[in-house]
Amino acid sequence: MNSFPWLTIIVVLPIFAGSSIFFFPHRGNKVIRWYTICICLLELLLTTYAFCYHFQLDDPLVQLEQDYKWINIFDFHWRLGIDGLSIGPVLLTGFITTLATLAAWPVTRDSRLFHFLMLAMYSGQIGSFSSRDLLLFFIMWELELIPVYLLLSMWGGKKRLYSATKFILYTAGGSIFLLIGVSGMGLYGSNEPTLNFETSANQSYPVALEILLYFGFFIAYAVKLPIIPLHTWLPDTHGEAHYSTCMLLAGILLKMGAYGLVRINMELLPHAHSIFSPWLMIVGTIQIIYAASTSLGQRNLKKRIAYSSVSHMGFTILGISSITDTGLNGAILQMISHGFIGAALFFLAGTSYDRIRLVYLDEMGGIAIPMPKIFTLFSSFSMASLALPGMSGFVAELVVFFGIITSEKFFLMPKILITFVTAIGMILTPIYSLSMLRQIFYGYKQFNVPNSHFFDSGPRELFVSICIFLPVIGIGIYPDFVFSLSVDKVEAILSNYFYR
């Protein structure tokens, strides 16, 4: 156990440093922005330093572990730790949150509260990914919801209150099932509650109870991931939220659902996961086709990108349900890859809206000529979204396919059928992506508007876009960097399915 509390500092720094924002002058927007960005950069540097010098890549066990007794009466511990499964999402969270803070530069209304909520959300997300205690995981899961609700309801579009209410109803409803699952797992088989992940991983449950616990956790993660039919909050939320909030939602929030599915359902409840995996694979396949088809019919640009996110998360579900090293590594890579690509697409959609004040695709057109930089960036990330070879999405989807084909859990014909149907979904992806590009950038609608003049991408937008584009290309060319983080932990998780 590392004596220095790296993880505690990393988890609490954003929210505690963010609290001091309220002592800043009310009109000091510039100071508040720079302060928030500096906190995010400091947090990212601390995280990177701790992982580079104190994390062993070839060790599947929990590292940087901290365990402090918090509330004696409940035997509740502040228990944190990092392993190969959580290191990728934690680094992704730091990277995307820093860039989302920079993307929020134009926000001037209630600037202190806005930036505090961004930092509070940062703490909740890091805490969720590094928790080693079920109750602490639940608290961090809930802590992250409140800032999203306020960011959406106060800085959203015309229907922001409707979208915020829908978001909180869905997620709070899912959290009830999460709390039931945590309580059931903690109270079973012991006079005292046992909430430690390590203890729960070695606990055997009756099959019926394990299935009930699995289903409870699954509902909570299905809302976040999201899994159809519990996905309808996502397009509305993305359609109304400020694009910096959308970056956090698409880049990190959806990944929390996938992370929970692996961390708790797959690692702690392996028998139930083995029973549910065929159904999960069917749901993932349907989700890819359904969301891709629905995306094509969306007039709203941000809703089209939101449905594309639902479709891409279907590949993560397929990888998790394959119960193979290859498939699960592919699912983790898809989580990281989509975190970058989804955040970038929402950022570019938001910067385009700032200039032309249009969000409906059939009203756009012809802005490639006055805005060539935005056109180039949007085209590049659309290519990444449709899994162009050489970019991260291609490698992730290809590895997931190999995971399905090599899975010993399924017979040959179902594997061929699932691969064939999923391939149709991959064909639909370029259709809605290229159609979106054509409607926004080609034609003459905006170019022929009298006295129209649009500013192209500035240095801030270019910097944010290039910072996201470099990892997309880097992972596409050398995916082994991401695999090296998770491969040993994935083997340890899957050993439960063969030796337990």
UniProtKB/Swiss-Prot annotation:
Localization, UniProt: Plastid, Chloroplast thylakoid membrane
EC number: 7.1.1.-
Top-tier EC class: translocase
GO biological process: one example: electron transport coupled proton transport
Keyword Transmembrane helix: yes
GO cellular component term of the entry, any: chloroplast thylakoid membrane
Similarity comment: Belongs to the complex I subunit 4 family.
Entry protein name: NAD(P)H-quinone oxidoreductase chain 4, chloroplastic
Organism: Nandina domestica (Heavenly bamboo)
Lineage: Eukaryota, Viridiplantae, Streptophyta, Embryophyta, Tracheophyta
